[in-house]
Amino acid sequence: LNFLTEPLPESKRKKLLKLVASNLNRSHGIVCISEFVRHDLEQHRDLFQISEETPITVVHNGIFLPEEGQISGITRDPIVPNAPYLLALGVLYEKKQQHLLVPALCHLPEELHLVLIYSEAKSEYLSKIQRMIQQYRLEDRVHLLCAVSDVEKASLLQHCRALLQPSIAEGFGLPVVEAMALGKPIFLRPATSLPEVGGDVAYYFDEVSPEAIAGTILSGLSAYDMSPSQTEALRARARLFDYRRMAQGYLQFYHEILPI
């Protein structure tokens, strides 16, 4: 439901509202991918004309969790920087807030790089990030990678120091689960659905000044490095989002809703 709060032309917002409402108010049941989304939808039942009789339930997204042998078998792809790096993964939209990571890099050790993977981008936001990279003279430390393959993405996740997700608008956050499944430390914005996914194994950006972000990353990496059990704690958290649990959730929902 991001379109309700995003800075969109009013004509487009009305068009989206009509489209979403026409789907929701004819449904016999609705599945949300997080408790955050369910709460948001419950708050807008009247707006979407959803009957009070229509059940709204939650089935978290799930992934195929890698086995131990698969993790150790992920090789270092040539696309991976030849330096320790932090990773951010997602579309380059203003709501994802990746631009906050660029000035923060100035307050981190020079040997640490930043990799931004994106599948698509708003041209003005991509230009904004590129200008910031030039402004802070970080051309050699920030890597923008568009539309990487699944093999490349797996390698970039496996060899990163940590995953960073400073977004202020998430319905779920699959990259967080993908990183946890590999035992990688995760740094999240305490907003929307992200705390629901990261739980108590994540580190959170409570403040987003460059110095505060860098401080959170440094203290989190230090704590992670000094706690060998943290890797297994992250993997255990990821197991809550196994695709089999997701499938079972949908199966149960269909049994409750459909006359089968």
How would you describe each model-predicted region?
Residues 1-260:
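Carbohydrate transferase catalytic cores enriched for Leloir-type hexosyltransferases
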